[in-house]
Amino acid sequence: MAQTTTTAFEATFFEFDQPAAANHPMTCFALYGKGGIGKSTTAANIALALASQGKTVMLIGCDPKADSTALLRRGKPVETVLSLLRTRHKSQLRLEEMVTRGTGGVLCVEAGGPKPGVGCAGRGIIAALEALKAQDAFNVCKPDVVIFDVLGDVVCGGFAMPIRDGWAKNIFIVTSGENMAIHAAANIAVAVGTFSERGYARLGGLILNCRDVPREREKVEELAGDLHTRIVCELPRSEEVQHADEQGVTVMEMAPEGPMAQRYRELARAVLAACETTPAAPKRAGGSSFTF
């Protein structure tokens, strides 16, 4: 990639300190993707699949809607970190105010966001993660796995915050074969590639969340080829998952022995395995049919 000058945005973004390193082995990864693609459902089911294996899992929602952990709390709202920061300084917050336990003991955190039309959601995510750092959340809670669920329609400084080294070192993009989902996935991958070159993160692969559109697998495989990555798991479209969502729970909780629960367990294993490998940095291949 050609040498570029640092933009005002990047200068602002990189002035934040790196999070303190955890004193125990820990796997951190983030799920990105177009809004409505199923990131939060996927993240919650992966979290519960890993928790059912005896792992301590922390799920951090980085979406202004603050609904990333909803399926692990049966729809019960959780106080967001940003709402707490409106009342006092980050140094005055208690960790137990920011971190709550959900189904299976999953540690749930919601960054939150500003009121619609006021403030910057990306900056809110930065503030929330800095508040967790101030309370040394990783070393106190000692999670084995940390999952960031991040809105990926716009990869600005705040929404890119989890990509930074010390937060999420492995990025997985949830996509379907729909054109807008593929377009968003391609843009996210380019952003990840930029950070990879600086040593911040790497693309672990694509998660195909099927919508049963024509040539779906073929289109996503073509995208994976363009990005020099792979599909780590395919999730078939399932009424079982939709029914669980309507009930406000994960399919891992509603039907733990069902076929979709088994598929999420396979996905959880595949993601952890991918985190242990070192794939090439994502980049655009010559002759790609996708517009980045």
Predicted regions and their residues:
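Extreme N-terminal, non-catalytic leader segments
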Residues: 1-37, 41-58, 93-94
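C-terminal lobe/tail of nucleotide-utilizing enzymes
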Residues: 1-23, 193-292
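Conserved beta-strand scaffold positions in the cores of enzyme catalytic domains, especially
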Residues: 28, 59, 106-108, 231-234
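Residue-level signature of catalytic and energy-coupling elements of molecular machines
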Residues: 35, 109, 128, 149, ...
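N-terminal phosphate/diphosphate-binding loop that engages ATP/GTP or pyrophosphate donors
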Residues: 49-111
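Short, glycine/acidic-enriched loop or turn micro-motifs at the edges of active sites
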Residues: 64-66, 113, 152, 212
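Flexible beta-alpha connector loops of hexameric P-loop NTPases
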Residues: 113-123, 179-180
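Conserved catalytic-core segment of NTP-binding enzymes
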Residues: 134-145, 150-234, 243
